[in-house]
UniProtKB/Swiss-Prot annotation:
Any GO MF annotation of the entry: single-stranded DNA binding
Protein name according to UniProt: Protein RecA
HAMAP family: RecA
Listed NCBIfam families: tigrfam_recA
Protein family membership: Belongs to the RecA family.
Annotated CDD domains: RecA
């Protein structure tokens, strides 16, 4: 750069600093670039698929899927992991449906959890913004976008048509929230529901969409699509769901990774089940017929018994997890081939 341009830039920078404060504009090389902090999800498979060891702090995350697919369970497990590390968690329950007993079973310290059950969408988002600006919250969950009902809709008649009201509310709120979220280093998770687009018949185009307009799709650094794909049985009794989680957007690591995990009723994501599956894949756990073995020791006949053995021997589970973390680097997880992309994967 020639001297005249340097002087002009120096004058401009000093004027900006005088008007807007020190640090308003800086050279990237002037500050140390730190790795993004992450909060574990409670699923080792998902943490590795996300590429940074969990969900990123200081960012917006969207988790969406059909009903009863495990969205709230996943967020409650992330809250539990955050609390274990001494973090503070808040839950904005716009659906008025949080079960504290179930949350406790997943490891959430319910006594320390900040809970709000707002009356309107504006109130929910204002409370969220105030908590974020306090700089004291490590993780916040808003459940759900679909339940953030604008005040005008609540005060109006049942059949009133108010097109685009919720989308405008979300767009305005995210414009305000995003900067505060970054400054306070808070992880904010929006749970969202699916709706069907009317008249979408184009081949290869998904008729599904999320509620609340397009703003959240753009502001979110990570978007997770979570779906139930099967049942887990113990004899004739169904004890949980087999669940597929797909990373459809990731600004911090390669996207489109996906994992298939187990969510057990009353327990949440099966840590031991994941360890067994990943152990077999990594050839750390041997499977001969119905028997599973680890380190030359038989750990159970059938997956359910092997899961129980690891639960009763936490030191063995911890050793297997350490071996798996060493074996599976985030870059080694490959995208599963042949899967259909769903719900605007390019967003």
């Amino acid at each position: 750069m020639d001297e005249n341009k340097k002087r002009a830039l120096s004058v401009a920078l000093s004027q900006i600093e005088k008007q807007f404060g020190k640090g308003s504009v800086m050279r990237m090389g002037d500050r140390v670039i730190e790795a993004v902090e992450a909060i574990p999800t409670g699923s080792l498979m998902l943490d590795l698929a996300l590429g940074i060891g969990g969900l990123p702090k200081g960012r917006v995350v969207e988790i969406y899927g059909p009903e009863s697919s495990g969205k709230t369970t996943l967020t409650l497990q992330a809250i539990a992991q955050c609390q274990k590390k001494g973090g503070t968690a808040a839950f904005i329950d716009a659906e008025h449906a949080l079960d504290p007993i179930y949350a406790g079973k997943l490891g959430v310290n319910v006594d320390d959890l900040l809970l709000s059950q707002p009356d309107t969408g504006e109130q929910a988002l204002e409370i969220a913004d105030m908590l974020v600006r306090s700089g004291s919250i490590d993780i916040m969950v808003i459940d759900s976008v679909a339940a953030l009902t604008p005040r005008a809709e609540i005060e109006g008649e049942m059949g009133d048509q108010l097109p685009g009201l919720q989308a405008r509310l979300m767009s305005q709120a995210l414009r305000k929230l995003t900067g505060n979220i970054k400054r306070s280093n808070t992880l904010v998770i929006f749970i969202n529901q699916l709706r069907m687009k009317i008249g979408v018949m184009m081949p290869g185009q998904s008729p599904e969409t999320t509620t609340g307009g397009n703003a959240l799709k753009f502001y979110a650094s990570v978007r997770l699509d979570i779906r139930r794909i099967g049942a887990i049985k113990k004899g004739d009794e169904i004890i949980g769901n087999q669940t597929k989680i797909k990373v459809v957007k990731n600004k911090l690591a390669p996207p489109f990774k996906q994992v298939v995990t187990e969510i057990l009723y009353g327990e949440g994501i099966s840590r031991e089940g994941e360890l067994i599956e990943m152990g077999v894949e990594a050839k750390l756990v041997e499977k001969a017929g119905a028997w599973y073995s680890y380190g030359g020791e038989r750990i159970g006949q059938g997956k359910d018994n092997a899961r129980g053995y690891l639960r009763e021997n936490p030191h063995l589970a911890a050793k297997l997890e350490a071996d798996l973390r060493e074996k599976f680097e985030p870059t080694e997880l490959s995208r599963e081939e042949g899967d259909e992309d769903t719900l605007e994967d390019t967003m």
